[in-house]
């Protein structure tokens, strides 16, 4: 490695490599260690002493070696501590006392106290950002109250955060017990017991049983989410003191018919033991709430406790004091650690400020080693190396950019121009850290991560790539344990879950104790609708900036080109992190997510990675506890796997209303299919298996649209918060649902309960004065909270307003999760009957609204009786009113005979009248908008113009991000003509009023000539030479690993395999893959054959008996997909026929509403505008014709050709003349 000498600033003569040169104290190979005696087992698992390590470095860094010896990598063993070179100095990576060359916040390292003599550990107020659950075993000679609470083993909940005075703190909370419930009658019958003491003995016997004891000793059956403060003991050490059993009276959550009953409340000293007993003690007995972890118990069982916010330390109930942990007993990298119990904590719910947490924005660059350096690197290949890591460090409190670090394998010189530009922007100069080997680089990065200990980390696609690559590399190649590199020093969670390995996951997950990972790629895909989510496209759209791109294929040559060229890679790497940092502070995702965490009382990591279900579950669990209900246990444990299983169903529910968009269905009200599938499932989540659903679940309902182009005003009424308001208005809940009228004895229909026909079953829900809905209470409180928060925004400071806006947005997200929570068959607490009832009520509301409008406002006189102001809004047309569409929570009403201004003005009064006359509070209609012109295509597909000329569209191809810009441009141009051009709009209205078949034999209205000119322009443009490939790029998401696709003949998969065939950089899962469709050439056919062989879709040639040559087989469009970069670099011709056909197909689907939704007729009529391809007479034939006296025809000019086409379209004879 080259580095700058401290004495004379002269570059070091060469990269140090143990395989080509000797230096003092460095010797390749393995040998004796420096240790002479066995040290005391460390209380940490992060590296503090390394005497030898696996040395892997690229040969291209051997700058003085011949060119033919600079390919591949060196692999061996090096005996010396890991080193880093910075600004001409050499440092021991693991020597904390030497000062180091990166910023450090940690003050306790390797059991030694570096806090200084004047350090004062005292604090009172502290902020919590993460919570970790651990198990701890107390020694027998420890007399403290905390030892008593964890003997022989107990759960400890550690609150990680920062004190008001800026100390990094870890507060260990003891005495939080895991507990669950079992019905006393069921347990007594199964075990032949009658008392609590007998139950304790039975559970101890269960733990002592030979087979189960071994499992308990191995940690099966319990939850371990953080570090460990002590060793684990086997089942043989379980005693009666480990359990506490009480007999309590509760009611199960499911169904109104459930009565209060006696339950055993079984609590255990640790979640591992409690989980083991819950799973293994008489599995046939139904358990309640056994999957709830002790972190959730701490937050829910104590008033106002929060997962993210401020606390104050105080004396306990009986004056007990907190205990300061000595440095030698620290289990985290915090400055101060204390022991306490829940009563030592006082939450401060109204404090919204954040302490000075730190954000690390990082990016890694990798390079393939042996073989083809152009291949994309794989972490488990030891030769595929991490060559650079950029780390930009920010303060979340001030948003200041405080440090820039670049970890580089080999020497790296950042240009002075780049450093000066950083200073000019007010950013720190980059600090370059140079390493001899990849091991040293990675150990240094992990050590920096430990010593700087940022609370938050971000980057772009770090979950799918950067974190995953680092974790796989250090564990598989270097066998480094990562459990000590989070906040905990040992036994902490540091794990990546790859989406490709879990069928249920929608996205990969990263969970690192004490470090919250916020991936800006996920934020961008959720907040933006773009055809590409490459970083350059996102920052271009959001920030108006563009990154300087360095193609992956150029990295090897730059890397081998010396320190200056490696500096270019470094600048590129830093640039990516810098742009992501700007995106982070643009969207501030930590504010919204932390607001969700506070409201749902779950950790930030769970908010980010564990789906919607858990958010509602914890809130319901807390309210149920206050109302003396208990929740049945789910068959899965209460962890990320439970939510992962429900994510797929949540996705299905989100998309269910689009299922029949492209099909023709009968008139009237129709619905979508069963969103949860047809398999049997148990609604009580923990009841007896095999109990199937008794009700078919149908999704959102719609009133069929009156397709066409509407030039009269169309007012749109929306139901405000439809599903939450239905749940509130009709008191829907697990606890208010009755399945049999027997359970309603003594109650009067309509007065005390409502009956709903759902499918072929009657469902009954009691009214609120009989039993109030728990879901309704949650929604009411949340919506009131949101209203109060929004009311504070106008009078708040700008900083407070941002926080409040994120808070109200978080409340909205959770409110909208309630309906989906009940409707997921394999969720945490399913009740499909509630979800089915909600959609049934929504359907009835649409029908009632339609009937009300058609009867109450049927004539002009009736309308003016209801709204006298309507008299002044008459126009020349005869009056009529009609509901032309109903879409789940919206109603479209067309008024003829009223002005647009009048309908707009009357809209609010009309919606209030319908709400008052038809619906219970809080259900209400609101006037959302009024269309001046509306092209209503099919369900959930329309385009229109509202007041002020603003265009609104939904569901049409024009706004789909997978279309290319060429198609979007011309399709949008045609839509603009339809909506904004009076001539075209008038012509379109005439077309709509005539049966579509008639237009086949008659001319289109003359206003359509402008349509024709646009189509001719598009045709001429696509048939012209020198097309810009960028205008024809389409994209599709790689939703899962390619081998997981059933149908592999998809365009973006074809491009994926072509990239693999050419050893290009491969897209990650969830990334959008760009592609174009190319012409079918011989080269395209050859590559299609290779790709089909790679993905196992090759077709066997057809064998015929004759030797006759077979006709050329036309390839599928998917086989003709190609990488746009490859097309540009190699001048591959585009498939212009495909693109123009695609344009025709797109606009035909959009404008089919003009022609009775007949796509074929629409396309045939539009094809009238397309010029015929002229037939070229062969030269020889032309000469013969000329000699015979025929005149040579000259081709038409484009203008003349367009004139003739339009004349043909608009002057078509209605009948052909008869020949004489």
Curated annotation (Swiss-Prot):
GO MF terms here are: DNA binding; DNA-directed DNA polymerase activity; nucleotide binding; RNA-DNA hybrid ribonuclease activity
Record keywords, A-Z: DNA replication, DNA-binding, DNA-directed DNA polymerase, Endonuclease, Host nucleus, Hydrolase, Multifunctional enzyme, Nuclease, Nucleotidyltransferase, Transferase, Viral DNA replication
Q: In the Enzyme Commission scheme, what number(s) does this protein have?
A: 2.7.7.7, 3.1.26.4
The record, for Gene3D superfamilies, names: DNA polymerase family B, C-terminal domain, Helix hairpin bin, Palm domain of DNA polymerase, Ribonuclease H-like superfamily/Ribonuclease H
Compositionally biased spans, kind Polar residues: 646-660
Instruction: State a GO cellular component annotated for this protein.
Output: host cell nucleus
Where located?
Host nucleus
InterPro entries named in the record: DNA-dir_DNA_pol_B (IPR006172), DNA-dir_DNA_pol_B_CS (IPR017964), DNA-dir_DNA_pol_B_exonuc (IPR006133), DNA-dir_DNA_pol_B_multi_dom (IPR006134), DNA/RNA_pol_sf (IPR043502), DNA_pol_B_thumb (IPR042087), DNA_pol_palm_dom_sf (IPR023211), DNA_pol_type-B (IPR050240)
Pfam families assigned: DNA_pol_B, DNA_pol_B_exo1
Provide the catalytic activity annotation. DNA(n) + a 2'-deoxyribonucleoside 5'-triphosphate = DNA(n+1) + diphosphate; Endonucleolytic cleavage to 5'-phosphomonoester
Q: Region labeled Disordered — which residues?
A: 21-43, 641-691
Q: Which GO terms describe its biological process?
A: DNA-templated DNA replication; viral DNA genome replication
* Entry superkingdom: Viruses
Assembly, per entry: Forms a complex with the ssDNA-binding protein, the DNA polymerase processivity factor, and the alkaline exonuclease. Interacts with the helicase-primase complex composed of the primase, the helicase and the primase-associated factor; this interaction may coordinate leading and lagging strand DNA synthesis at the replication fork.
**What family is this protein classified in?**
Belongs to the DNA polymerase type-B family.
**Main function:** Replicates viral genomic DNA. The replication complex is composed of six viral proteins: the DNA polymerase, processivity factor, primase, primase-associated factor, helicase, and ssDNA-binding protein. Additionally, the polymerase contains an intrinsic ribonuclease H (RNase H) activity that specifically degrades RNA/DNA heteroduplexes or duplex DNA substrates in the 5' to 3' direction. Therefore, it can catalyze the excision of the RNA primers that initiate the synthesis of Okazaki fragments at a replication fork during viral DNA replication.
Q: This protein is called what?
A: DNA polymerase catalytic subunit
What is the species listed in this Swiss-Prot or TrEMBL entry? Answer: Equine herpesvirus 1 (strain V592) (EHV-1)
């Amino acid at each position: 490695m080259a580095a700058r000498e401290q004495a004379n600033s002269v570059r070091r003569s060469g990269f140090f490599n143990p395989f080509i040169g000797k230096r003092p104290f460095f010797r390749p190979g393995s040998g004796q260690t420096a240790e002479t005696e066995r040290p005391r087992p460390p209380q940490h698992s992060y590296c503090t002493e390394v005497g030898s390590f696996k040395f892997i470095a690229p040969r291209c860094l051997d700058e003085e070696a011949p060119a033919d010896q600079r390919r591949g990598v060196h692999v061996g063993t090096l005996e010396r501590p890991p080193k880093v070179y910075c600004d001409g100095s050499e440092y021991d990576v693991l020597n904390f006392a030497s000062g180091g060359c990166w910023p450090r916040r940690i003050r306790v390292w390797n059991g030694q106290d570096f806090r200084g003599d004047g350090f004062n550990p005292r604090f009172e107020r502290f902020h919590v950002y993460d919570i970790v659950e651990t198990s701890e075993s107390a020694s027998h000679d420890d007399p403290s109250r905390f030892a008593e609470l964890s003997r022989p083993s107990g759960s400890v909940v550690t609150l990680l955060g920062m004190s008001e005075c800026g100390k990094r703190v870890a507060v260990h909370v003891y005495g939080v017990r895991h507990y669950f419930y079992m019905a006393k009658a069921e347990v007594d019958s199964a075990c032949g017991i009658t008392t609590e003491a007998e139950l304790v003995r039975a559970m101890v016997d269960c733990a002592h049983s030979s087979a189960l004891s071994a499992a308990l000793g191995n940690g099966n059956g319990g939850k371990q989410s953080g570090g460990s403060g002590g060793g684990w003991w086997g089942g043989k050490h379980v005693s009666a003191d480990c359990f506490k059993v009480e007999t309590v009276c509760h009611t199960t959550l499911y169904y109104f018919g459930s009565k209060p009953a006696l339950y055993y409340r079984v609590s255990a000293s640790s979640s591992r033991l409690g989980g083991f007993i819950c799973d293994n003690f008489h599995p046939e007995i139904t358990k309640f709430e056994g999957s709830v972890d002790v972190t959730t118990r701490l937050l829910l069982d104590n008033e106002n406790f929060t997962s993210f916010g401020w606390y104050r330390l105080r004396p306990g109930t009986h004056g007990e004091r907190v205990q300061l942990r000595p440095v030698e007993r620290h289990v985290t990298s915090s400055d101060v650690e204390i022991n306490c119990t829940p009563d030592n904590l006082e939450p401060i719910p109204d404090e919204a400020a954040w302490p000075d947490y730190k954000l690390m924005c990082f990016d890694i660059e990798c390079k393939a080693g042996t073989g083809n350096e152009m291949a994309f690197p794989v972490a488990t290949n030891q030769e595929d190396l991490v060559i650079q890591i950029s780390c930009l460090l920010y303060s979340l409190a001030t948003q200041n950019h405080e440090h820039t670090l670049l970890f580089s394998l080999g020497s790296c010189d950042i240009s002075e121009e780049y450093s000066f530009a950083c200073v000019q922007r007010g950013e720190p100069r980059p600090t370059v850290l140079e390493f001899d080997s990849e091991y040293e680089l990675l150990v240094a990065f992990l050590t920096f991560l430990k010593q700087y200990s940022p609370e938050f980390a971000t980057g772009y696609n770090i979950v799918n790539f950067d974190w995953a690559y680092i974790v796989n590399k250090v564990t598989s190649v270097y066998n480094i344990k990562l459990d000590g590199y989070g906040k905990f020093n040992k036994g902490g969670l540091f794990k990546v879950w790859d989406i490709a390995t879990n069928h249920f996951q929608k996205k990969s997950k990263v969970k690192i104790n004490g470090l919250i990972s916020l991936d800006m790629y996920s934020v961008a895909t959720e907040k933006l609708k773009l055809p590409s989510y490459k970083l350059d496209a996102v920052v271009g759209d959001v920030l108006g900036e563009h990154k300087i791109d360095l193609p992956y294929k150029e990295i090897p040559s730059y890397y081998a080109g010396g320190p200056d060229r490696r500096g270019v890679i470094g600048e590129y790497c830093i640039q990516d992190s810098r742009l992501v940092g700007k995106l982070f502070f643009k969207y501030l995702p930590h504010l919204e997510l932390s607001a969700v965490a506070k409201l749902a009382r779950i950790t930030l990591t769970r908010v980010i990675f564990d789906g919607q279900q858990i958010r509602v579950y914890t809130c319901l669990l807390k309210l149920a506890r206050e109302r003396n209900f208990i929740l049945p246990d789910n068959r899965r444990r209460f962890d990320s796997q439970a939510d992962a299983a429900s994510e797929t169903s949540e996705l299905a529910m989100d998309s269910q209303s689009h299922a029949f968009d492209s099909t023709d269905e009968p008139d009237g009200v129709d619905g979508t299919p069963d969103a949860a599938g047809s398999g049997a499932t148990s609604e009580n989540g923990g009841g007896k298996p095999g109990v199937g659903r008794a009700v078919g679940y149908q999704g959102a309902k719609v009133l069929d649209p009156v397709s066409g182009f509407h030039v009269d005003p169309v007012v749109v009424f929306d139901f405000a918060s439809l599903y939450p308001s239905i749940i509130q208005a009709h008191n829907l809940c697990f606890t208010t649902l009755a399945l049999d009228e027997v359970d309603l004895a003594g109650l009067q229909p309509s007065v005390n309960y409502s009956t709903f026909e759902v499918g072929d079953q009657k469902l009954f829900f009691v009214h609120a004065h009989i039993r109030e809905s728990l879901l309704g209470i949650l929604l009411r409180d949340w919506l009131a909270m949101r209203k109060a928060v929004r009311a504070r925004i106008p009078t708040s400071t700008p900083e407070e307003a941002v926080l409040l806006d994120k808070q109200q947005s978080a409340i909205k997200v959770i409110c909208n999760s309630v309906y989906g929570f009940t409707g997921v068959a394999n969720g945490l607490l399913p009740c499909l009957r509630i979800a089915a009832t909600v959609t049934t009520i929504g359907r009835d509301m649409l029908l009632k609204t339609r009937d009300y409008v058609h009867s109450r406002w049927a004539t002009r006189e009736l309308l003016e009786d209801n709204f006298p102001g309507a008299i002044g809004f008459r126009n020349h047309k005869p009056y009529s009113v009609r509901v032309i569409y109903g879409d789940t929570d919206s109603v479209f009403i067309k008024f003829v005979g009223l002005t647009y201004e009048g309908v707009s003005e009357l809209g609010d009064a009309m919606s209030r009248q319908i709400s008052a006359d038809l619906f219970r509070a809080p259900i209400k209609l609101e006037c959302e908008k009024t269309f001046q012109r509306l092209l209503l295509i099919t369900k959930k597909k329309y385009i229109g113009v509202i007041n002020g000329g603003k265009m609104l569209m939904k569901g049409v191809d024009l706004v789909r991000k997978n279309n290319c810009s060429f198609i979007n441009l011309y399709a949008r141009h045609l839509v603009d003509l339809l909506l904004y051009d009076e001539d075209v709009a008038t012509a379109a209205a005439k077309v709509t009023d005539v049966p579509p078949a008639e237009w086949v034999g008659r001319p289109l209205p003359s206003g359509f000539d402008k349509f024709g000119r646009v189509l001719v322009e598009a045709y001429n443009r696509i048939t012209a030479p020198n097309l810009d490939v960028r205008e024809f790029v389409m994209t599709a998401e790689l939703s899962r690993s390619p081998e997981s696709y059933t149908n592999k003949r998809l365009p973006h998969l074809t491009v994926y395999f072509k990239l693999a065939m050419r050893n290009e950089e491969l897209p990650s899962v969830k990334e959008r893959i760009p592609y174009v469709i190319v012409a079918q050439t011989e080269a395209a056919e050859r590559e299609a054959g290779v790709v089909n062989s790679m993905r196992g879709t090759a077709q066997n040639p057809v064998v015929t008996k004759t030797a006759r040559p077979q006709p050329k087989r036309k390839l599928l469009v998917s086989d003709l997909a190609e990488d746009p970069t490859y097309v540009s670099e190699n001048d591959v011709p585009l498939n212009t026929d495909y693109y123009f056909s695609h344009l025709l197909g797109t606009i035909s689907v959009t404008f089919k509403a003009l022609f009775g939704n007949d796509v074929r007729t629409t396309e045939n009529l539009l094809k009238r505008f397309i010029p015929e391809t002229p037939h070229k007479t062969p030269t020889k034939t032309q000469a013969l014709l000329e000699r015979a006296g025929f005149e040579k025809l000259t081709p038409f000019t484009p203008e003349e050709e367009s004139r003739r086409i339009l004349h043909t379209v608009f002057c078509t004879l209605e009948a052909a003349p008869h020949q004489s």
